[in-house]
């Protein structure tokens, strides 16, 4: 029976391809790629000759229907992305969901993942972590997401485009406060590096593919609770958080009833 193979590919070093991934890519009829031109560098290097189909976030449903039909017609299909595992901050989840709903077999061929590699190489100590991928561009959405995880005691991991690096660090500091941060750059590539700094003095270089690990909240006192409730609320409102979210956050940080904080918010 034909299948969809979800195949992990190298995140920088072509030698990180697995034997099973190569065997799979050489055996399938079709390979769905995020960017066919980008994937050709890997596929040509290993003499993979399957037919390529462009599958990306702008054609996931339309192309996905065609790919599922090809599998139902007896052709084996693999999906890869530009780097790492499909469906993790990359296209793939929609196609896998369509296959599951239609009873089409799905098999994973695991490979490198940038956020897991970053945790391993950074030196951050943790028993768990939260992975958020890329933050949205819109300020309101970004604030809403960050505010949900500001009190997390485990590290929070982000993917960051180089041109957004300093802005993202500033946005995170506005909601999280000052934290230690690990900037993992160009993982498995020639200029691989880890910069350990803090959000308040952040000055990491804006180049390369970046994974940012922000340490979780410690048990130390929150300096914001030394402010008045009014100033505490203003801190979050000025960062772009809406009143409801700010009230919830301040109430949680001060261990106060939300209604009490809300009454203060009404006076601002």
What does each of the following model-derived ranges do?
Residues 155, 159-268:
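A contiguous loop/helix-start segment that scaffolds small-molecule binding in enzyme catalytic cores
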Residues 2-4, 74-78, 155:
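Loop/turn-to-beta-strand initiation segments
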Residues 91-95, 243:
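Glycine-centered tight-turn and secondary-structure capping sites
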Residues 25-31, 104-106, 155-156:
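Short active-site oxyanion
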Residues 94-152:
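Class I SAM-dependent methyltransferase SAM-binding "motif I" and its flanking Rossmann-like core
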Residues 1-58:
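Glycine-rich, flexible N-terminal cofactor/catalytic loop recognition
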Residues 55-61, 135-139:
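Conserved helicase motor
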């Amino acid at each position: 029976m034909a299948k969809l193979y979800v195949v992990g590919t190298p995140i920088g070093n072509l030698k990180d391809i697995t034997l099973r991934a190569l065997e799979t890519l050489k055996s399938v009829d079709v390979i769905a790629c995020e960017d066919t031109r980008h994937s050709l560098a890997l596929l040509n290097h290993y003499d993979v000759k399957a037919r390529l189909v462009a599958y990306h976030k702008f054609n996931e449903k339309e192309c996905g229907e065609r790919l599922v039909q090809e599998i139902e017609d007896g052709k084996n299909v693999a999906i890869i992305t530009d780097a790492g595992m499909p469906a993790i901050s990359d296209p793939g989840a929609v196609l896998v969901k369509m296959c599951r709903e239609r009873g089409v077999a799905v098999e994973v061929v695991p490979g490198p993942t940038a956020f897991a590699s970053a945790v391993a190489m950074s030196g951050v100590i943790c028993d768990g972590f939260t992975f958020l991928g890329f933050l949205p561009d819109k300020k309101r959405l970004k604030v809403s997401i960050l505010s949900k995880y500001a009190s997390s005691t485990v590290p929070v991991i982000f993917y960051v485009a180089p041109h957004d690096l300093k802005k993202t660090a500033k946005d995170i500091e506005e909601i999280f406060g000052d934290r230690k941060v690990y900037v993992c750059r160009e993982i498995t590539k020639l200029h691989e590096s880890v910069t350990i700094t803090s959000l308040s003095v952040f000055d990491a270089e804006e180049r390369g593919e970046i994974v940012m690990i922000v340490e979780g909240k410690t048990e130390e006192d929150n300096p914001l609770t030394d402010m008045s409730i009014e100033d505490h609320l203003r801190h979050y409102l000025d960062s772009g958080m809406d009143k409801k979210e700010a009230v919830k956050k301040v109430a949680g940080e001060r261990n106060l009833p939300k209604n009490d904080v809300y009454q203060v918010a009404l006076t601002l």
